[in-house]
Amino acid sequence: MKDERLTPHPDTECLTGANKCRVYFNKSTKEVEGTTIYEADYVEVDALTREDVIVAIIRTKYSLNKELGIRREYINNQQGAAEKWNGFCLFVEEAQSIANNLNL
């Protein structure tokens, strides 16, 4: 089954006083009776460090087990592993870019 969460959404919200940050993904809009409703999944990060935000974004698409499986396949030069690894790396770069924009 293909994972439709291709990229994290760049919207983030830092919750002042709570030392938390929300990173939104799968953002969409829909019209209900003439009103636009915004929907999004999000992950909440307990600490406001750059690394915590990056890992939280990565986990919106890749569980730790899935990430380790991709790494293992790549290390063992399995067929199709390079493509999966490149996709993972691109997602990590996008996560890093989002975290950098937060100026944490």
Spans of features found by a protein language model:
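A preference for well-ordered globular domain cores
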Residues: 2-104
